[in-house]
């Protein structure tokens, strides 16, 4: 027995030395072959993981400061992963657009992508057949060719928001959240929602949990993905307790919406929405139930946050920079009449270029969305840097959108900056919808909805700052559902108040 133990010590020691030698050789070979841009100094094993702030706003500022120090690109090492941050539109356009076929996949995130989604959330899917099929179906149903199919939902939800602004102006933030959730819910599942809708609240809650999983270091298996493949008992995998719970709750919430739609269809109600069109085309016969449920559900998650945050930014920009509102009204009054003759309609937007510019500025100014990395599917070289397949490349959105070298007076809400842009391409000039072949597939409908709402809100309402409650500029706003700042809303005139009451009251009645 003693002899065996005495032999085990040198054997184990030799194996450990061989492993260290192997890892050392692999490390030097890797860094001899590949060259990352401006690798930010970190600590052994963890890299920069412990340096990155957990708070979202603080993290945006931290990344912005690194961009000022290192320039257009820098690299953070988070555990065993390398993240390259793009800090200029030039670099982002070159890599994500011009070389989009190489940067088409998603970073490997075991926690949100595998454990909490089982590979079924489109936003986390790697490049492959399922991702291509789902993108094709979404484009087929809600792409540019069908932009008018869902116009009735956009019209009625914008009218409901106007009426809520008129009757409950202090609840503008909740009204924005209701509008965003109800619009996307009606587009996807054919159901309108009220403030405090219980299933919407549950979906938002699980989506917030997904967003927390993006925080660097929030889950050990995202920083050290190899841990996901070690067959450990579930009892000592705390990430699975969290992720499994989010998946089960998401499946339950999404299934409830599918079952509700099926019941309405059995009752003979004519419901035109993404899922009903999906079924009409027979696409539901080609995938399993859970994948179908998550396809619809993740459209809800993706659409509601973006719309709500954009509306909050519009309110803040209009209150802080009333000159932009006055400029917009010059065009609106020419089209709709200065004395509240009628509401702007979707058909008017083509004659309102400044409204389109406001839409772009809303999606640029001080806005903060989660960064979801693109992942290289093959090695690439760029300006002396050599990047391996699997490298994560992230657009530093808030930092670039608020960078004076990219945008003149970035703290200023100034739609005029986009008047010389191609206003018929809403995704140009900012990256709020993403970029390249991973651009949001619903950007056409989202842009149309935003333009209509901007036109109607600026035509009918005044926005005022509240003394003693300054609106912060130059600091990222959180994506949470709480009221981000104080703003006073009033009708533009008694005539405009009467117009909203007459034209919008019926839309605010939700069953």
Where are these regions (language model features)?
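Conserved cytochrome P450 catalytic core segment spanning the I/J/K helices
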Residues: 143, 219-222, 242-310, 341, ...
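N-terminal membrane-proximal hinge/A-helix region immediately C-terminal to the signal-anchor transmembrane segment
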Residues: 2-118, 133, 155-160, 249, ...
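Conserved cytochrome P450 K-helix E-x-x-R motif and the immediately C-terminal K′/meander segment
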Residues: 50-64, 69-71, 322, 341-383, ...
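Cytochrome P450 heme-binding "Cys pocket" and the immediately downstream C-terminal segment
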Residues: 104, 194, 322-324, 443-484, ...
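Cytochrome P450
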Residues: 1-19, 77-84, 147-156, 165-186, ...
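Central I-helix of cytochrome P450 enzymes
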Residues: 180, 189, 246-257, 281-333, ...
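Cytochrome P450 catalytic-domain helical core, especially the substrate-recognition surface
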Residues: 41-64, 82, 110-189, 204-260, ...
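Conserved cytochrome P450 K-helix/beta-meander segment immediately N-terminal to the heme-binding cysteine loop
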Residues: 395-422, 504-507
């Amino acid at each position: 027995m003693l002899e065996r133990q005495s032999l085990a010590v040198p054997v184990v020691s030799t194996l450990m030395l061989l492993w260290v030698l192997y890892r050392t050789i692999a490390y030097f070979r890797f860094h001899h072959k590949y060259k990352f841009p401006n690798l930010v100094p970190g600590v052994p094993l963890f890299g920069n993981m412990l340096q990155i702030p957990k708070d979202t706003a603080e993290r945006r500022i931290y990344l912005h400061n690194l961009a000022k120090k290192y320039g257009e690109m820098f690299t953070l090492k988070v555990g065993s992963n390398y993240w390259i941050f793009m800090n200029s539109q030039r670099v982002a356009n070159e890599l994500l657009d011009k070389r989009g076929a190489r940067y088409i996949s998603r970073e490997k995130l075991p926690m949100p992508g595998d454990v909490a989604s089982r590979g079924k959330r489109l936003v986390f899917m790697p490049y492959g057949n399922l991702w291509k099929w789902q993108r094709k179906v979404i484009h087929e149903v809600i792409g540019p060719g069908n932009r008018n199919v869902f116009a009735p939902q956009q019209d009625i939800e914008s009218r409901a928001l106007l009426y809520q602004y008129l009757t409950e102006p202090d609840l503008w933030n909740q009204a924005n959240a209701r509008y965003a959730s109800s619009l996307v819910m009606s587009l996807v599942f054919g159901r309108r929602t009220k403030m405090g809708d219980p299933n919407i609240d549950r979906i938002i809650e699980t989506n917030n949990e997904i967003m927390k999983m993006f925080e660097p270091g929030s889950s050990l298996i995202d920083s050290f993905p190899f841990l996901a493949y070690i067959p450990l008992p579930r009892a000592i995998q705390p990430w699975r307790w969290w992720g499994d719970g989010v998946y089960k709750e998401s499946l339950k919430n999404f299934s409830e919406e599918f079952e509700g739609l099926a019941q309405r269809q059995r009752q003979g109600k004519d419901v035109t929405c993404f899922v009903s069109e999906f079924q009409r085309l027979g696409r539901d016969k080609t995938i399993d139930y859970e994948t179908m449920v998550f396809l619809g559900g993740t459209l809800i998650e993706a659409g509601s946050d973006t719309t709500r945050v954009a509306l909050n930014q519009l309110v803040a920009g209009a209150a802080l920079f009333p000159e932009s509102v006055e400029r917009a009204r010059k065009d609106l009054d020419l089209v709709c009449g200065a004395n509240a003759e009628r509401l702007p309609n979707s058909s008017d937007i083509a004659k309102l270029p400044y409204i389109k510019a406001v839409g772009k500025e809303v999606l640029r100014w001080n806005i903060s969305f989660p960064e979801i990395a693109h992942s290289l599917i093959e090695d690439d070289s760029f300006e002396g840097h050599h990047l391996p397949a699997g490298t994560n490349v992230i657009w530093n959105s808030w930092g670039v959108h608020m960078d004076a070298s990219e945008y003149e007076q970035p703290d200023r809400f100034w739609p005029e900056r986009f008047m010389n842009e191609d206003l018929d391409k809403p995704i140009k000039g900012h990256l709020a919808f993403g970029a390249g072949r991973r651009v949001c597939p619903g950007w056409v409908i989202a842009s149309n909805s935003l333009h209509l709402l901007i036109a109607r809100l600026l035509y009918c309402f005044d926005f005022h700052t509240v003394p003693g409650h300054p609106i912060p500029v130059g600091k990222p706003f959180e994506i949470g559902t709480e009221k981000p700042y104080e703003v006073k809303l009033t009708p533009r005139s008694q005539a405009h108040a009467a117009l909203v009451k007459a034209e919008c009251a019926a839309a605010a009645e939700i069953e």
